[in-house]
UniProtKB/Swiss-Prot annotation:
Protein name, per record: Taste receptor type 2 member 7
InterPro entries, per database record: GPCR_Rhodpsn_7TM, TAS2R
UniProt keyword annotation of Transmembrane helix present: yes
Glycosylation sites: 151, 167
Stretches assigned to the Extracellular side: 1-9, 71-101, 150-187, 257-266
Topology feature Cytoplasmic, residues: 31-49, 123-128, 209-235, 288-312
Subcellular location, record wording: Membrane
Disulphide bond pairs: none
Length: 312
């Protein structure tokens, strides 16, 4: 790549990452301050904080990988650094998806209205189950992250060296194919939490439809709190599903780069697209949460006041 292309792509990557990190840091900070003030944290705040912190780590790893790829490509020839980056990328990637799924499940059980005994049993205990569920997600993510480092053999590291023209050999192709297949298989595991979120979304839609029909029969209107809660939860879940699909497409671009002549450019483009998912979803969550939205309005008002004071 040319120097101008490198500079432009790095600038875009840094801007995307910083915006996302600020959004997720805001979520974590507001919930942490609320925890310190009230000496307790609600289940929804715990999920949002865990999700925000996992995405901050994910964005830092993606940005670090972009910087290394452009500025220090020879780093990928050293096994230790590559293993660390790959491990934490896989870990934070899985954590982000699993925590977002926990958020979808929480919205479903808290807001939806069904009368099945199992649903009601979980609905009444969902607040107590959240911490255990998040810990289980952490353990699962750790288990899924370990296998990816086992395929980073010396042969593979020599094959991904960007300065050498040995990518056409059969041995390199086999090594890269094996590594890529492991990454693809590990990410296929994320289809399960994605499916759970999709089912939660569909059931929320069903619950909203039943609720609106009931409102029509009672002639009470559509602006009741339950309808508003349904709509907000549905928006949060559908935004996650759409952005996650975009993220998966970006991952496929980055993974397929092992078989492309301009692999460095393909990886960076994949990572630029991947950064959209954790960055934009954080602001959707802020706008959909009344406490976070009010806090963001207060911050913006203070910033506006400070800027006016400096002007005069």
């Amino acid at each position: 790549m040319t120097y101008e292309t490198d500079t432009t792509l790095m600038f875009v990557a840094v801007c995307e990452a910083l915006v996302g990190i600020l959004g997720n840091a805001f979520i974590a900070l507001v919930n942490f301050m609320g925890w310190m003030k009230n000496r307790k944290i609600t289940a929804i705040d715990l999920i949002l904080s865990s999700l925000a912190m996992s995405r901050i780590c994910l964005q830092c790893i993606i940005l670090l990988d972009c910087i290394i790829l452009v500025q220090y490509p020879d780093t990928y020839n050293r096994g230790k650094e590559m293993r660390i980056i790959d491990f934490f990328w896989t870990l934070t990637n899985h954590l982000s998806v699993w925590f977002a799924t926990c958020l979808s499940i929480f919205y479903f059980f808290k807001i939806a209205n069904f009368f099945h005994p199992l649903f009601l049993w979980i609905k009444w205990r969902i607040d107590k189950l959240i911490l255990r569920t998040l810990l289980a997600c952490l353990i699962l993510s750790l288990c899924f992250s370990l296998p990816v480092t086992e395929n980073l053999t010396d042969d593979f590291r020599r094959c991904v060296k960007t300065k050498e023209r040995i990518n056409s050999t059969l041995r390199c192709k086999l090594n890269k194919a094996g590594y890529a297949s492991v990454k693809v298989n590990l990410n296929l595991v994320m289809l399960f939490p994605f499916s759970v979120s999709l089912v939660s979304f569909l059931l929320l839609i069903l619950s909203l439809w039943r609720h609106t029909r009931q409102m029509q029969l009672n002639v009470t209107g559509y602006n009741d709190p339950s309808t508003t809660a349904h709509v907000k939860a549905t928006k949060a879940v559908i935004s996650f599903l759409v952005l996650f699909i975009v993220y998966c497409l970006a991952f496929l671009i980055a993974t397929s780069s092992y078989f492309m002549p301009e692999s460095e450019l393909a990886v960076i483009w994949g990572e630029l697209i991947a950064l959209i998912y954790p960055s934009s979803h954080s602001f959707i969550l802020i706008l959909g949460n009344s406490k976070l939205k009010q806090a963001s309005v207060r911050v913006l008002c203070r910033v506006k006041t400070m800027l006016k004071g400096r002007k005069y």
